[in-house]
Structure formats: C-alpha cells, structure tokens
Amino acid sequence: MKKAYVVLPLVLLGFALAYFTLMRDQDKPNQATLSDVQKSAKTSPTDEVTSDKALETLIIGDPSARVTIVEYADFKCPNCNKFHQQVGKQLRTDFIDRKLAKIEFRNIPFIASDSRPAAEGTYCANDQKKFVQYHDKVFEFMWTNYYRQDNSKEFDNILTVEKLTELAGEAGLDKTAFNQCLATAKHKSSVDSDLKKSEQDGVTGTPHIIINGKAVVGPQSYSAYKTLLEIALR
C-alpha cells in the first residue's frame, strides 16, 4: 500500500509539471531559429533598392578603405548592442574615421518579430543616404532604454513601424518617405539577400564579424579586434 501512496503524488506532480511547462511555452514568443530565417529568405532579381547600385551595400566609413569589416547584426540582439557600445564605437574612432577600414553592415533579423522592420529600415534610410544616422539612432535607442539595464525586453515588440519612423525623423530622415518605404516592404529582398549571404558565410549567431574575409570566432575584446585590424593593414 505504501507504494500506491508514493506513486499517486508522483503522478500528480507529473501532471503539474506538464501543465506549467505548457503554460510557460505559451507565454514565450514563437521564436524562429536563425537557420529557419536564413532558409526562408528569398532573393529577387527585381530588387527595388535603388537605381544607384552602390547604395545597395550598407557602408560605414570610406568605401575605398583598404580593410573591410563585415558585421552581421540584429538591432534586437543584446550582444549586438553591447558590441556597438563597447567595440564598435572605438573601432569607428581608431579605424573607420581615419579611413583605414570600413564596415559593411549586413542585417540578420531573427531575434523577434520587430527585427525585420528595423532591418528593412536600414535600406530605407540608405535611400536617403542616411543609413549611418539611422543605424546609430536605433542602436542608441535600444541600449539607452533597454539593454543597458537588462535584456528582458529582447522578445518584446518595441521597434514598430511607428517607433522606427519616429527614430528616423530624429536621425534627420524624411519621415513620410521612410514610413512609406517600410509600409510597402520595398527592401524585403535586400534583407533576404543579407540573410542568404549570412548562410553562405556560415553565420550561426550575432554579432558575427569578418575582417578581410576571415571570421572572428567568439566574443572578443576591443584589443583583439585592434590587433587583427593592425595585422590586416600591414
């Protein structure tokens, strides 16, 4: 009889755990994996980025700089925001502003549902030749209001079309043109192209940095990036 008394509570405990697991999973956003997002991306030969093909590449710095830093990032990624604050800004000062290197920014929106409009916004901003201003404004907004304190809002729908349009206006863009660009998904194929490139480059997480064709594995300090760039410049 003692066994029966032991088994019954265990069965009840099992049901309770199953119930709370189900409820917990229902509270979580339905997150697609990076691999899923990469595979779902479709490129189109009729991409409407702009008639100026040079604007299809999102560049920070002098396009003719000797060294190219490819940065794959998601504006909703906490580590991308941390990289921007702790490494990216210093790289800009020491290498980008001095025209020694340039950053080619590639979107990889997979964290949350609002990652995608934020990514497409980079190309909308680039239409107005204000990609860098938009890029910096969105990262600063996320860091100052959220990720500087904690990462708990990672999956919340923060970067709505309305919020992105507001930030674009603060960055000096024409809000009406920007909003229309986002609303019509004008640059969907441009972001899909970024995702396809990320798959080809073996990107499995963000941020993912490539310096002159060589991937930098794992999170690194600023001094590590500085050393790698100095070697590339020799």
List where the protein language model places each region:
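Cysteine-centric redox/oxidoreductase cores and disulfide-bonded domains
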Residues: 109-206, 210-234
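Extracytoplasmic thiol/disulfide redox context detector
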Residues: 1-110, 180, 187-200, 230-234
